[in-house]
Amino acid sequence: MAKELRFGDDARLQMLAGVNALADAVQVTMGPRGRNVVLEKSYGAPTVTKDGVSVAKEIEFEHRFMNMGAQMVKEVASKTSDTAGDGTTTATVLARSILVEGHKAVAAGMNPMDLKRGIDKAVLAVTKKLQAMSKPCKDSKAIAQVGTISANSDEAIGAIIAEAMEKVGKEGVITVEDGNGLENELYVVEGMQFDRGYISPYFINNQQNMSCELEHPFILLVDKKVSSIREMLSVLEGVAKSGRPLLIIAEDVEGEALATLVVNNMRGIVKVCAVKAPGFGDRRKAMLQDIAILTKGQVISEEIGKSLEGATLEDLGSAKRIVVTKENTTIIDGEGKATEINARIAQIRAQMEETTSDYDREKLQERVAKLAGGVAVIKVGAATEVEMKEKKARVEDALHATRAAVEEGIVAGGGVALIRAQKALDSLKGDNDDQNMGINILRRAIESPMRQIVTNAGYEASVVVNKVAEHKDNYGFNAATGEYGDMVEMGILDPTKVTRMALQNAASVASLMLTTECMVADLPKKEEGVGAGDMGGMGGMGGMGGMM
């Protein structure tokens, strides 16, 4: 395949054109007065969004060199979204600003490598300053404020996320689903829940809810299929004498064993329910072990030399209450020791650090949440499907932002934290003039998020930035109301992690682009038209008339 090459300033200008076009589309969504962007879909209604990364992902240019620039900035937005969950527009605006200022310096004859070194030094200083300014985000009010800002000033979303976090804890799993009504709803599942229901409907003892409810039951955990009742006789006799109910969690219960359990349950000899173990393969073994630790039981597995025939009441777990429906089993208040549960959580966390698969990490996080006690489901309500998609994306953004805030703390929002962090650059000096220029490029660039927020709100950016820079601490400009004041008191907060990741990712890609000296792309293919004259040979088919 033939290639096209561009060098030096020509290459950088082409990249800059792509970056500018992408940033122009993304930056209109920034801040409380940001505008919507409508995205065409190949099927169905168009999507309306105010989410920077959604806009960035849709953009692709026909011009290959422009597209390369745009794709690199798209990577900034995606990486910031993946690691911090928010701050995609901030990252895009910062990357464009660093690149524009840097390109002017390179065009004036400065050394791109020294500019990059200066920018890197400045980013390090600003990051340290941001972390020093950061305050821990502990109370529900602060969590709600972070969620509200990230959800484009929708207080209902901020409040429901704060409520969910309060109920399931910082480690709990919060999932977002489509609702059926117009209002957002929150459902909280206390205790450990897994997606397996009763094997037979004959175990139901609450006809009203179509569920099986067991009070203070024993729990038998078996890592194999159970088909013979003989294996379980000693355990069943012990349970019958105790007068307590029994929940059996096994790979499967079938045939004679299932029939006998159903008959005993219906006659009232042993109150019992059987469910299949959650998960598959190694994950099933791990989840059975989780349940064992949560309920102070023992998994009956031939791998560790324990047989079902030799099982005793000491091997069984216990819980305060268990509810089994057609699709789910919920274990409430397992009797496991807190120290053992915490050790298990720490062990799973260590696995999360090591895994490279996002899917595995998500499943491990779910196991942590189930052990820590709680899963919350936010059902998003909306009038139309278009609104539902847009609102659901905002709830997910806000959820990521609040998690980031809990992790690394919060700083004043609205671009104020970056303006305050400029102080860290006052005493910073590079090894030469070109590095000093790199530091100054970043000094100007970190004003750009506030400038864009103010511009989108219809105010004069330079006036606002200068006024905010004259003051100290959390003093800033509320673009939603047009008022100046303490940003923290007004509830305008940003997670430190989001601001930090946006700056680091933007500077990383922008300085890479500044040091680009050559670009290589495929030449566009020339479309070869099919000659219509070739069809002339078909005329010979006229002789087929004789076939009639």
Swiss-Prot record:
Keywords: ATP-binding, Chaperone, Cytoplasm, Isomerase, Nucleotide-binding, Stress response. It comes from the Bacteria. One of its GO terms (biological process) is protein refolding. InterPro entries: Chaperonin_Cpn60_CS, Cpn60/GroEL, Cpn60/GroEL/TCP-1, GroEL-like_apical_dom_sf, GROEL-like_equatorial_sf, TCP-1-like_intermed_sf. PROSITE patterns: CHAPERONINS_CPN60. One of its GO terms (molecular function) is ATP binding. Its EC number is 5.6.1.7. It catalyses: ATP + H2O + a folded polypeptide = ADP + phosphate + an unfolded polypeptide. ATP binds at residues 29-32, 50, 86-90, 414, 478-480, 494. GO terms for cellular component: cytoplasm. It is found in: Cytoplasm. The keyword Chloroplast does not apply. Belongs to the chaperonin (HSP60) family. Together with its co-chaperonin GroES, plays an essential role in assisting protein folding. The GroEL-GroES system forms a nano-cage that allows encapsulation of the non-native substrate proteins and provides a physical environment optimized to promote and accelerate protein folding. Forms a cylinder of 14 subunits composed of two heptameric rings stacked back-to-back. Interacts with the co-chaperonin GroES. HAMAP family: CH60. This is Chaperonin GroEL. The gene is groEL.
